[in-house]
């Protein structure tokens, strides 16, 4: 028995302008996202490679692609996972293990609680925040055998924001 599909979906925000960011705010965010990716993924890789099948999907963020003011730590952490996704995909592709990332934009979750949706949806071409179900559908596809020719990709799901 082994784990065929791994979804790395850890992340916290400790938003602050870098000028006033504490070392703890920086370290905590990077530890959860970037070190979390390593600490969960690395022990599971060997069995995926031996069995010659695996799907790894990393949940990142538009902040990791675009960078957002007040989120230098979060942007760096998610950007690091994006780079690791691309590198690891090249390491394991020949063993039929795919590694991809999903970069949600504004999705109605605890992470966007407190953000003024009416203000932000003016900037989103589809005119609304996304739903967790829409993200789950994309992740489900990437976790399936149907996605066997997709690896090392970062797929944005953001209603057309920052494309």
Predicted regions and their residues:
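Substrate-binding pocket helix/loop in short-chain dehydrogenase/reductase
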Residues: 17-18, 25-30, 56, 112, ...
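Active-site loop immediately N-terminal to the catalytic Tyr-X3-Lys motif
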Residues: 19, 66-72, 94-95, 127, ...
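Active-site helix of classical SDR
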Residues: 41, 77, 85
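C-terminal substrate-recognition "lid" of short-chain dehydrogenase/reductases
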Residues: 45, 53, 129-157, 161-162
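Alpha-helical segment proximal to the catalytic Tyr-Lys
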Residues: 46, 90-94, 148
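Residue(s) in the substrate-gating loop at a strand-loop-helix junction
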Residues: 61
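Catalytic Tyr-x(3-8)-Lys segment
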Residues: 116-134
């Amino acid at each position: 028995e082994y784990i065929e599909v791994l979804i790395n979906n850890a992340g916290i925000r400790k938003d602050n302008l870098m000028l006033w960011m504490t070392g703890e705010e920086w370290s905590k965010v990077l530890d959860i996202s970037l070190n979390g990716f390593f600490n969960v993924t690395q022990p599971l890789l060997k069995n995926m490679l031996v069995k010659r099948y695996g799907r790894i999907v990393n949940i990142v963020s538009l902040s990791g692609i675009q960078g957002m003011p007040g989120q230098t730590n979060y942007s760096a952490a998610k950007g690091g996972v994006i780079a690791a996704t691309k590198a690891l995909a090249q390491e394991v592709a020949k063993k039929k293990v795919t590694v991809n990332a999903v970069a949600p934009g504004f999705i109605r979750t605890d992470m966007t609680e407190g953000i003024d949706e009416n203000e932000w949806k003016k900037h989103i071409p589809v005119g609304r925040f996304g739903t967790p179900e829409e993200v789950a559908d994309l992740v489900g596809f990437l976790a399936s055998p149907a996605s066997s020719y997709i690896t090392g990709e970062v797929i944005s799901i953001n209603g057309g924001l920052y494309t």
